[in-house]
Amino acid sequence: MALTVNTNIASLNTQRNLNASSNDLNTSLQRLTTGYRINSAKDDAAGLQISNRLSNQISGLNVATRNANDGISLAQTAEGALQQSTNILQRIRDLALQSANGSNSDADRAALQKEVAAQQAELTRISDTTTFGGRKLLDGSFGTTSFQVGSNAYETIDISLQNASASAIGSYQVGSNGAGTVASVAGTATASGIASGTVNLVGGGQVKNIAIAAGDSAKAIAEKMDGAIPNLSARARTVFTADVSGVTGGSLNFDVTVGSNTVSLAGVTSTQDLADQLNSNSSKLGITASINDKGVLTITSATGENVKFGAQTGTATAGQVAVKVQGSDGKFEAAAKNVVAAGTAATTTIVTGYVQLNSPTAYSVSGTGTQASQVFGNASAAQKSSVASVDISTADGAQNAIAVVDNALAAIDAQRADLGAVQNRFKNTIDNLTNISENATNARSRIKDTDFAAETAALSKNQVLQQAGTAILAQANQLPQAVLSLLR
């Protein structure tokens, strides 16, 4: 190796190596003080890109987890309010059952209706005041809302909330006021009152054609229609008023047949006498007779059986039993029809009932001939009968209220079931998000974080190299001094 003064190759080489070890030492110190292996793009360009992408995902997952927790809280708030609504509806139903009992007077039912009105108002108040984060949940304005539960666009879970006010929940009804017919047949009793034909039910994505035989009772028709389309329930009733008048010189005798059971009534002289004899045979006939404060006798078959009156020879020289059936407008007909009259030939009179259809969802009814109107009154698209409209101040109104409240409860229960399902869905989503976030964080750590064991070893190595390089540089810088020995 040449001996020179102007150029000290050994020193330059030592400086280069010392500079490299110094840079490595600085890098180790930075990694150990920050805890990150990658502090800038120069440390690992590809690793920085991957770790940043993972950081974005982790941040999004954490936000999505908070969003899902908000969804659970909202669903719990709505579900809690619906629980109170359920309690109110159950109370209204209890009151309706109490009002439907024949032991109540008109004044009793009016008092019960006052509590129903208060419960109706509270039901609406709950729907109007239930809020979460400033948003009303049960007044019908919420609709369907999406919750972002993922770190990417359109990763959502939807919550739908319906209007739960008293005016919004209830039953889609046909025949809610009832309708009936009275037909007289001379001689032996035969099927009469309802003509044969078909009633068409459309709803729930299905169409069902119900065949009706001539003379079918409302009970038989209801049994055919109950559950024929999704969510549809059918209830049959026979309701009519009866009056005994003009009995002179003796009494009236006649048979009453309900379904397959017949009872002979003898010595009937007044409306009260008719009511007493019917009630004494109530367990056999399955009908009830009640006289209200105005002296009006109402006879009811809660199952919708046909009620037949068969005349016998009586001792009265004059007198009659006349009935009024309920029309499709809910009112009893103005003109009474004689079903038993003294001194007449043997006849059989058949009083038919009506069918009420209820469903929490919309449907329609039509029929061939006169079947639909005979059974349901003016049948058409089902009309919504809400909880706000129920009135239990009459026995029939109480019966209708039970059906309306039952469907309202079904709607509330369905909404609560949806909320329970979405809460479980949110919980499962949170568990999944937490798992993904944990694994993504672990992956980012392996890429970006400092391995302290390896880095402290590198630090020790670089410190030794730094010290050795400094010492060797001092020696290398002394090499040009050898020239002086040649000059002596």
UniProtKB/Swiss-Prot annotation:
Entry's Gene Ontology BP terms: bacterial-type flagellum-dependent cell motility
InterPro entries: Flagellin, Flagellin_C, Flagellin_C_sub2, Flagellin_hook_IN_motif, Flagellin_N
GO molecular function: structural molecule activity
GO CC annotation: bacterial-type flagellum; extracellular region
Domain of life: Bacteria
A Pfam family this chain is assigned to: Flagellin_IN
Subcellular location: Secreted; Bacterial flagellum
Chief location bin: secreted
Post-translational modification: Phosphorylated on tyrosine residue(s).
Residues making up the signal peptide according to the UniProt record: none
Function: Flagellin is the subunit protein which polymerizes to form the filaments of bacterial flagella.
Protein family membership: Belongs to the bacterial flagellin family.
Identification of the protein by name: B-type flagellin
Organism: Pseudomonas aeruginosa (strain ATCC 15692 / DSM 22644 / CIP 104116 / JCM 14847 / LMG 12228 / 1C / PRS 101 / PAO1)
